Amino acid sequence: MSKNKLSASSGRWLKEHFDDKYVLEAQKRGYRSRAIFKLEEIQNKDKLLKPGMTVVDLGAAPGGWSQYAVEQVGDSGQVIACDILAMDSIAGVSFLQGDFREEAVLDALLERIQPDMVDVVMSDMAPNMSGNPSVDQPRSMYLVELALDMCRQVLAPNGSFTVKVFQGESFDAYLQEVRKVFKVVKIRKPDSSRARSREVYIVATGYKG
């Protein structure tokens, strides 16, 4: 791709981004990213987050989901967040920076969590996209498998799980896997999710334990 084409493409993306009503609304309300509106829409429909809950937020940076979650769980709840990228501190959020795929980071995260104490695991994780679906999709599915494994280790009975998944190879098999361990499983495509994106959110409630 030529430099001019790249610049034109980048310019279009920037214009779309800054003209985006969700970006503007996030800035207006003091949230760190437009992604908060995806979680807000899920919350409005599925009521996953309640005062006093313990929540694990995977792929948390820059912190929009953690900001919203800590508002919902209140002072009596807690949010434990993890991301490979740095994240500015948020009151009420315990943040661990590290690569969730590495065993040492996973162990450090688990040290902050007692078994069966987590009410909600939420994941907005995504790999760095190469633009090649045959590479990106397996990387993405690996992350969502890890998120489901986290549920098996820390979720309380009847706990909930919401995870971003890209539709493509292995999506149906993953959905069946989630259905084995949760009583109710729904697929959400929030209005704030860009139409061209293959992303959807699996919302699972009633962890069987």
UniProtKB/Swiss-Prot annotation:
It is an enzyme of class 2 (transferase). It is found in: Cytoplasm. It comes from the Bacteria. Signal peptide: none annotated. S-adenosyl-L-methionine binds at G63, W65, D83, D99, D124. GO terms for molecular function: rRNA (uridine-2'-O-)-methyltransferase activity. One of its GO terms (cellular component) is cytoplasm. It catalyses: uridine(2552) in 23S rRNA + S-adenosyl-L-methionine = 2'-O-methyluridine(2552) in 23S rRNA + S-adenosyl-L-homocysteine + H(+). InterPro entries: RNA_methyltr_RlmE, RNA_MeTrfase_FtsJ_dom, rRNA-MeTfrase_E, SAM-dependent_MTases_sf. Transmembrane segments: none annotated. The active site is at K164 (proton acceptor). Keywords: Cytoplasm, Methyltransferase, rRNA processing, S-adenosyl-L-methionine, Transferase. Its EC number is 2.1.1.166. Belongs to the class I-like SAM-binding methyltransferase superfamily. RNA methyltransferase RlmE family. Specifically methylates the uridine in position 2552 of 23S rRNA at the 2'-O position of the ribose in the fully assembled 50S ribosomal subunit. This is Ribosomal RNA large subunit methyltransferase E. It comes from Aliivibrio salmonicida (strain LFI1238) (Vibrio salmonicida (strain LFI1238)). The gene is rlmE.
